[in-house]
Curated annotation (Swiss-Prot):
Gene responsible for this protein: pyrB
Quaternary structure annotation from Swiss-Prot or TrEMBL: Heterododecamer (2C3:3R2) of six catalytic PyrB chains organized as two trimers (C3), and six regulatory PyrI chains organized as three dimers (R2).
Entry protein name: Aspartate carbamoyltransferase catalytic subunit
Organism, scientific name: Clostridium botulinum (strain Eklund 17B / Type B)
InterPro entries (UniProt xref): Asp/Orn_carbamoyltranf_P-bd, Asp/Orn_carbamoylTrfase, Asp/Orn_carbamoylTrfase_sf, Asp_carbamoyltransf, Asp_carbamoyltransf_Asp/Orn-bd
Top EC class, one word: transferase
Amino acid sequence: MIKDKHLIDPMDFTVEELEEIFKLAHEIILDPEKFSHVCEGKILGTLFYEPSTRTRFSFEAAMMRLGGKILGFSEPNSSSASKGESLSDTIKMVSIYTDIIAMRHPKEGSAKVASLYSSVPIINAGDGGHQHPTQTLTDLLTIEMLKDGLSNHTIGICGDLKYGRTVHSLIKAMSRYKGNKFLLISPKELRIPDYIREEILRKNNIEFLEVETLEEVIDKVDILYMTRIQKERFFNEEEYLRLRDSYILNKEKMNLAKSDMIVMHPLPRVNEIACEVDYDKRAAYFKQAEYGMYARMALMAKLLGVL
């Protein structure tokens, strides 16, 4: 039972609780209309201190498709944060007016702080380069739907593995399922943080390999998870420009991959996946975005205790 829990980190839920969410998501996918009134009278607060299109729209569409309503802001200048109001005060006030809160904030650990002051469930919609657990729910649901389960996969993760919060969350989550292996593809400047390597992978004896070129491992992966080089995480413009075009997935590279491999991406993409790949049947990133809405519908329904 996950009613009234916060979702700050993908590890906040047990594997059994995640399966409960995925089971409901499957039911919603099969018959969305059946669930179109379950959140009538409920209000989602959306507090986005960082720009977002897909995550914010996904949350808002999810609540609206459940029959609920939305209050919130899409950037801090339109809130009292621009006047210097503390995060704790904002959360205390918003939790009076809403039943559940989705928050994105540039500071790592901000979602955890928010949960200490909220009287309603807090969903972390991204806190700096730290965690993005609802993207992880989206990713897991996509893998479960398209690859027949969450175990025994070789997962290639390519691009910005240092600052990419979706990457950190995905590795932590998929490490809980047996038989998964990771191929970590990045320039040396953007390798995974030490705590992921040591505390998640090595500590749990999970097989992984770090490489610098996509071509040398693309034929081995079942799931290729592409990420963009995130300009907003760089203080040095020259370093960003040098690394931006490090890895571009195109038709030629796709020809080296397995016929049943799937390509995922948390979006937005810049140029790391060529548009020609969109027409390949293995391109799953737009279906992944669609599944994200259903994952968030199931999550909010469970946290609110309406299902």
